[in-house]
């Protein structure tokens, strides 16, 4: 099943949680923080401006994005996978290789 977000919403798959620190200490599930990065799965058509025109989004499918620690409170389960639904304004930037 696929989801097509509306307007300026973006569907993101959160990156995997880190289970160990850089020093090799294994973290229990409750101690590990959820990552604030993810891969864009799907994007809406764009933000509707006051004059009725549509402004395209600045992110594309496949982009790796950084979002706020408390962003992504809206989640949806698709085929057993938890996906985040974010507004474009929740995204801080796009990581480039």
Swiss-Prot record:
Family matches, as CDD domains: cpn10 (cd00320)
GO BP terms in the entry: chaperone cofactor-dependent protein refolding
A GO MF term: metal ion binding
GO cellular component terms given for this protein: cytoplasm
Main location: cytoplasm
Pfam families on file: Cpn10
HAMAP family the record matches: CH10
Cited function: Together with the chaperonin GroEL, plays an essential role in assisting protein folding. The GroEL-GroES system forms a nano-cage that allows encapsulation of the non-native substrate proteins and provides a physical environment optimized to promote and accelerate protein folding. GroES binds to the apical surface of the GroEL ring, thereby capping the opening of the GroEL channel.
Name this polypeptide is given: Co-chaperonin GroES
Biological source species: Oleispira antarctica
Gene name as annotated: groES
């Amino acid at each position: 099943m696929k989801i097509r977000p509306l307007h300026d919403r973006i569907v993101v798959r959160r990156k995997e949680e880190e289970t160990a620190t850089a020093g090799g200490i294994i973290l229990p599930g409750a101690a590990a923080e959820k990552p604030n990065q993810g891969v864009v799965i799907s994007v809406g058509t764009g933000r509707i401006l006051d004059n009725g025109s549509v402004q395209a989004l600045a992110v594309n499918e496949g982009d790796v994005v950084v979002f706020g620690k408390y962003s992504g409170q809206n989640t949806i389960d698709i085929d057993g996978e938890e996906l985040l639904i974010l507004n474009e304004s929740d995204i801080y930037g796009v990581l480039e290789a």
